[in-house]
Amino acid sequence: NIVKNILKNKELNYNSITKKEQIFVRERSTSKILKLKLDYDKNNISEITPEMLQLVEKNSPKDNQSYSDILTNVYIKESELKFNPIKIVELKKEKNEELKNIGKTFKKLLENTKKDEYWRIKTGILGKKIPSTNNDSLGSDTSNTKSINIYKNTIKNYLGFATFKDKEQWEFLYKTNKYNFEIIGGTTMNSENVYVIDFSPKEKGLFQGRLYISIETFALIRADYKYAPNKLGKEMYMLGLGFSQTNFSGSIYFEKDMNKYNLKYFSFQNNNKFSLNRKIAWQKKKKRLLINKKLKEIKIGVDLVLAQKEVIELLVINQLKISDIEFNNFIEKKHVNVTYVNQFDKNLWKNHTIIEPTQEM
């Protein structure tokens, strides 16, 4: 009953005001190519040769790492979010010259497309039109500038973790019958008395962890949880596509202010595995009245297995209630500047409140 009361009292306990927050987000991602095999099937694009595919297979980095730090103000009104970055720092990616030249070849092909022509990527009956090279969704005007939507949508997605709306990530709150709960004691957090409750999965449950729940309000103040041993998340294998969630762990912490609870910090880690074993076609087509004409095509057999690990940390530095008018009056920029570095350094964030860089970074 104590755990069930978290969702019952959610609207009473957690702030849903129009507000401006300053937040710091750290993203760390690693990916490892476990298998990559490309088979040259058919081709009438003279600029792309079998040797190019061999170079892609040989030189594609087997281990990739990315790090980014984002300090930003966000304006929030119900489900709307506006993004006003203060500073964004990303790890500079090493570029393989041979892969870079191949990339230039593909870019040139896209640029040499007439108004009544377009490129399309296709696998089986599924296909998607490739945006033109001047489309904002491709990212940036220069190497140090990116579309704001790339970051805005990511931050909005991360903040969704703290709303408890994802019924799969917060399964133990929505499907309490799948879990065993045990009150192991009590403590105080920010002068508030709380239950300390451990939980573990029954046969169909997924997570194990510890909850800190207010005795007075039944608000979830802190949670630390992860996949229980021998448990996996989503798994999907269909038509040569595979995806499995192999690990998850998360922590979240709220602070009380004026009888409402506000997010202060969370972190979570996802481990996923992807596989692809399909033929993929890259086609150039000419628009016609009834059926578009295929001008060029390359078809490649792809056998790929990729493991990925993602670690996200988010710290709310401060929060200020604002009016709907102030929210509506703020106009976002279309692009943001990014600082690229070879390694992270404390001096990058001098005079700013952040999460300290790790030795690994």
Roles of regions detected by a PLM:
Residues 167, 178-185:
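Low-complexity, intrinsically disordered segments exposed to solvent
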Residues 213-214, 238-240, 280-283:
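Short, charged/polar low-complexity linear motifs in solvent-exposed/disordered segments
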Residues 207, 232-237, 273-278:
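A short, polar/proline- and glycine-enriched secondary-structure boundary/capping micro-motif
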Residues 1-166, 170-176, 190, 243-361:
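Surface-exposed, low-complexity/disordered segments
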Residues 182-234, 242-256:
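Feature captures eukaryotic membrane-trafficking machinery centered on endolysosomal pathways
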